Amino acid sequence: MLNIFKPAPHIERLDDSKMDAAYKRLRLQVFIGIFIGYAGYYLLRKNFAFAIPYLQEQGFSKTELGLVLAAVSIAYGFSKFIMGMVSDRCNPRYFLATGLFLSAIVNILFVSMPWVTSSVTIMFIFMFINGWFQGMGWPPCGRTMAHWFSISERGTKMSIWNVAHNIGGGILAPLVTLGIAMFVTWKSVFFFPAIIAIIISFLIVLLVRDTPQSCGLPPIEEYRNDYPKHAFKNQEKELTTKEILFQYVLNNKFLWYIAFANVFVYFVRYGVVDWAPTYLTEAKGFSPEDSRWSYFLYEYAGIPGTILCGWISDRFFKSRRAPAGVLFMAGVFIAVLVYWLNPAGNPLVDNIALISIGFLIYGPVMLIGLQAIDLAPKKAAGTAAGLTGFFGYIGGSAFANAIMGFVVDRFNWNGGFIMLISSCILAIVFLALTWNTGKRAEHV
């Protein structure tokens, strides 16, 4: 491992007179760093979808391009788990920045060499590599949150950070439009967001810090006098990969429950959003332009919903994440039913249902990652979150992309929505199995 990636060493503590001001300043600085950084990752995760119409003009089919699109999700799922283990033994300041920088380079190379976009196989390989580097984003952010924010405030703070998903994903469409207008080529779908991402990668290095102790500050639990009821022993000790995997992650049944819950939450998330333009135009009579606006509203509805969900889990459920997740998934169940059963010709109801799904679904998405952090020691936070992410993207996102299309082709939209409704129910069941975990949970 290169020295630059090693966890930053602890240094001598600051004087008590300087500690409070330094802690407040650095917490805000680090939070801004991982917020901007993760939003930057999203600029390079969904941009391929905007290139599909242009690549179709070159003779590629939807099936071929859908396979390339799935490469990102497949690679991301594996990478989030594997790179999560690596990130637990790395300095997130450089790990997060490196992943974004390398993802940007892949995007630039994708359109810099004409032979890349001449073959589905080569495009798949490049997007797989891009997805792998994308997996270096969430785990170091999760590790950073675990070190700089204590458990009783983490739900609210994490929900605010999670809005970076929506900011990065939502701003991509206008950035793509601007890039095409400026450079007069569809290839700007890749290189224009990549240039911005490279700039962001340097901002990450400027803003993010590893642990409070590496800045001369006490652990966050000591600073806020906010200790988990059943804290892990020696949680500031660096752990080996074997200890992380076999002592704290793979043998924790609650992590497995939320990993399975994540499969069904992600299936609903991507089964709705990735197919919304097609469903609205084919089944509900929307124009393509109107369906894009509906997509935009779906994404940005997730911002207040995510923040509210995190706040509820802290304020009303005392840092237990499952009750809030169950509550929001029950709401998703109702909204998906309305979205499905509302007759064509009622666009207002369709949009309200879609906005409601967006408002509600991102809360459970955020809470599962947060709950994984809560259920593991701080030094195993990246691996724990990586396990749930692996299940979400391999079992949920990639499955939604591939299976939804297959089912709709053979059983029409009713078949697809039966799968979405079933996924809502199964997500609720698996979340309910972790009802009392979180602040009150004991390690199993």
UniProtKB/Swiss-Prot annotation:
Localization of this protein: Cell membrane
Annotated membrane topology: Multi-pass membrane protein
Domain of life of the source: Bacteria
Biological role: Responsible for glycerol-3-phosphate uptake.
A Pfam family it matches: MFS_1
GO BP annotation list: glucose-6-phosphate transport; glycerol metabolic process; phosphate ion transmembrane transport
Residue intervals annotated with topology Cytoplasmic: 1-36, 85-93, 142-160, 208-261, 309-321, 369-387, 436-444
Gene Ontology cellular component annotations, sorted alphabetically: plasma membrane
Protein name per its UniProtKB record: Glycerol-3-phosphate transporter
InterPro entries xrefs: G3P_transporter, MFS, MFS_dom, MFS_trans_sf, OPA_Antiporter, Sugar-P_transporter_CS, Sugar_P_transporter
Topological domain spans for side Extracellular: 58-63, 113-120, 181-189, 283-287, 342-346, 410-414
Keyword field: Cell membrane, Glycerol metabolism, Membrane, Transmembrane, Transmembrane helix, Transport
Transmembrane regions listed in the UniProt entry: 37-57, 64-84, 94-112, 121-141, 161-180, 190-207, 262-282, 288-308, 322-341, 347-368, 388-409, 415-435
Family designation: Belongs to the major facilitator superfamily. Organophosphate:Pi antiporter (OPA) (TC 2.A.1.4) family.
A GO term for molecular function: glycerol-3-phosphate transmembrane transporter activity
PROSITE patterns according to UniProt: GLPT, MFS
